[in-house]
Amino acid sequence: MQIAYSFKKAKVFLVLILFNIHFIYSGPVKPKDPILRLAVIGLVHDHVNWILNRQKEDVKIVGIVETNKKAIARYQKRYSLSNDLFFDSYESMYKTVKPDAVSAFNPTKEHLDVVRYFAPKRIPIMVEKPMATTYKEAQEMAELSKKFNVPLLVNFETSWYESTYEAKKLLETNSFGSLTKMVFNTGHPGPQEIGCTPEFLDWLTDPILNGGGALTDFGCYGANIATWLLNGETPLRVSCVAKQSKPDRYPKVDDDTTIILDYEKKKVVIQASWNWSHNRKDMQIYGSKGYVNCKNAKDMILMKNEQVGEKKHIPQPISEAKKDPFRLLYEVVYKDVILEPYSLYSIENNLIVSKILSLASESSKTQKTQNWK
């Protein structure tokens, strides 16, 4: 019995030794990645559902700034948001929660106010497209970002599309020849028609708060992608026809707009409308030897040889940061990711976008082509 007892003690001792050896040589426990403590600025942009619906643990909403009681009640009920998340001013929210970053879902006209308040505090900022209602506002936002060395991102839905990135890769192979034309068709049947919330409609259809109608709402997509594909090249001239097809519904702003960007050796046509028969964000890119047709986020059609004809093409998968703007914001804050100049979210790109939209607006009012100055 004594021998059996001693053997058991020896086994226990051996197990303890092996455990300690494993603990010593397995190295330190890897710390958990930090959580991005995000403040949401505004609930009156229906895109806010993107962050409220997001079911990932790397980003946590720690504060919401909103004064619209109807919007607050709607989203509190839909997402079971606690009362202590809500604040009625930037200042009260900032003093209470000290967020790591802010994401703006307020009227475009108020983007500048967000940057004016949070940039001096060196809080990274992401706003919804477009960057601003005027080029002058966009310039001030860019200057504040540079002065305080704080990231400023502009979020477009098409920046999450696999087809968008695949199109650039295909163009860089030169297998479609030299680029000659790009056509962007963006929009939907109309904000009222698709059921936008009243709070969203109030400012989306206001020429001051939104900077225009379909021109700014959907003209920005084509300008953004074209600027990226052309590596920051600017057009020589901007022409625009902005119409009111439904003045009874949208009496203050345009609802069906065509923008033409004239470059030295190529042309870009942007058809931005609240009068399409269906939702669409598609683009056709034409080269001297063929074309790339991005029908939506994932479906593509290519043609390199007319005799062979068209063929379907499946885009390559993209990284999580490209598919998810909030993951990109996380990596900008915690992984020191720096946006490339003229990339889709970048200030450089969106300054050009803002100037294009401003010149397009002027062209539609004067009925004259505007030169790039």
State what each model feature region is.
Residues 2-13:
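Bacterial N-terminal signal peptides that target proteins for export
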Residues 13-22:
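Bacterial N-terminal signal peptides
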Residues 21, 25-80:
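N-terminal Rossmann-like dinucleotide-binding module
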Residues 28-32, 101-104, 332-373:
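C-terminal helix-rich "cap/oligomerization" subdomain common to oxidoreductases
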Residues 46, 161-249, 367:
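Predominantly a Rossmann-like dinucleotide-binding segment in NAD(P)-dependent oxidoreductases
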Residues 71, 81-144:
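Beta-loop-alpha module in the N-terminal Rossmann-like domain of NAD(P)-dependent dehydrogenases
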Residues 140-158, 180:
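Rossmann-fold dehydrogenase core element
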Residues 224-299, 327-339, 359:
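Contiguous beta-strand/loop segments that form the cofactor/metal-binding neighborhood of enzyme cores
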